From Swiss-Prot:
Belongs to the universal ribosomal protein uS9 family. Residues 111-130 have a biased composition (Basic residues). This is Small ribosomal subunit protein uS9. Keywords: Ribonucleoprotein, Ribosomal protein. GO terms for molecular function: RNA binding; structural constituent of ribosome. PANTHER family: RIBOSOMAL PROTEIN S9, SMALL RIBOSOMAL SUBUNIT PROTEIN US9M. InterPro entries: Ribosomal_Su5_D2-typ_SF, Ribosomal_uS9, Ribosomal_uS9_bac/plastid, Ribosomal_uS9_CS, Ribsml_uS5_D2-typ_fold_subgr. GO terms for biological process: translation.
Length: 130
């Protein structure tokens, strides 16, 4: 019989994560690496694990994520949203808890585009009076 999988997509800045949950012991793999080895920072690890800890499902699911684009911070946020969406698919009763914690909301903040005549999005060239 085929193993049960739950799927969630997460996006943050320019990062896109595809997250698969399967019943298991609670391992988290990102791009075929262990979570700590991939992200490298404890704070980002905590961000990724937040949805599992809030719902109390930390040891019930194995998480396998493939993530591309953006930097590691954006990727961590994308994985977090993907996990939250997959948890709702696995158990719809978790939706109010995740919604209240704000884990089902896609963060709309994006990098502002650079404008011509400026050095960056808002940074103007140095002004000289004389």
């Amino acid at each position: 019989m085929a193993q049960v999988h739950y799927y969630g997509t997460g996006r943050r800045k320019n990062a896109i994560a595809r997250v698969f949950l399967s019943p298991g012991s609670g391992t988290v793999q990102v791009n075929d690496k262990e979570l700590g080895a991939y992200l490298g920072r404890k704070t980002l690890e905590m961000i990724v694990r937040q949805p599992l800890e809030v719902t109390g499902t930390a040891g019930r699911f194995n998480v396998r994520a493939t993530v591309s684009g953006g930097g590691i911070s954006g990727q961590a946020g994308a994985i977090k949203l993907g996990i939250a969406r997959a948890l709702v698919q696995a158990d719809p009763n978790l939706r109010p808890v995740l919604k209240k914690a704000g884990f089902l909301t896609r963060d709309p903040r994006m990098k502002e585009r650079k404008k011509y005549g400026l050095k960056k999005a808002r940074r103007a060239p140095q002004f000289s009076k004389r």
